[in-house]
Design a protein with these regions (language model features):
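Amphipathic alpha-helical segments of the small helical/lid subdomains adjacent to P-loop NTPase cores
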Residues: 1-39
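Accessory nucleic acid-recognition modules appended to NTPase machines
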Residues: 41-172
Length: 172
């Protein structure tokens, strides 16, 4: 398998070569774009059509939005979720809630973050001063970053305002 070959080359400290490197990078980019959601993967394998894959991923994101509205009728949960790409693009040390939800109390924000985490649509990465001493004793609940649980959905969410995630991204 490719994995066994890469492991063998890595262990022996031999380069993989340009051809294999290009193939692995193409496969990696493909995974980053399609993601791992079974419906999106199946659509890609059956059709090899990125437009159809993008439609599937947009449908999944719409289902997430519907679920968020059931959990939080104010729409704040959806705002926090939709802002993840912009927040990560800022390259800030943490998710800046105040730029998404101004004038909200910290305890209500923490409840919303807990709801997002429980929905299993995002991963929460908390800041810790000393992770060696045990994360639970050192994590700062007010300093965190949010990441989508699926890279393909993240790519589609980044371009949510477009009708279709641009072909140029898929064709690189």
């Amino acid at each position: 398998t490719t994995t066994a070959l890469v492991r063998k080359l890595f262990d022996s400290r031999h380069p993989i070569g340009d051809k294999l490197h290009r193939k692995l990078m193409r496969d990696f980019r493909l995974y980053m774009l399609v993601g791992g959601m079974p419906q999106a993967v199946n659509e890609y394998l059956q059709t090899n059509n990125f437009r159809k894959v993008d439609t599937i991923k947009r449908d999944i994101l719409n289902l997430y939005e519907d679920d968020f509205k059931k959990i939080d009728s104010t729409g704040k949960l959806s705002l926090l979720f939709d802002a993840i790409p912009a927040q990560l693009n800022k390259n800030a040390a943490r998710y800046q809630v105040s730029s998404v939800l101004a004038n909200d109390r910290a305890d209500s924000i923490l409840e919303l973050i807990a709801e997002l985490k429980d929905s299993k649509t995002v991963l929460v990465s908390y800041h810790a001063n000393d992770p060696n001493a045990g994360m639970s004793t050192n994590k700062d609940l007010c300093k965190f970053k949010l990441f989508l649980c699926d890279t393909g959905l993240f790519t589609t969410l980044m371009f949510k305002d477009k009708d279709f995630t641009e072909n140029i991204i898929y064709e690189k």
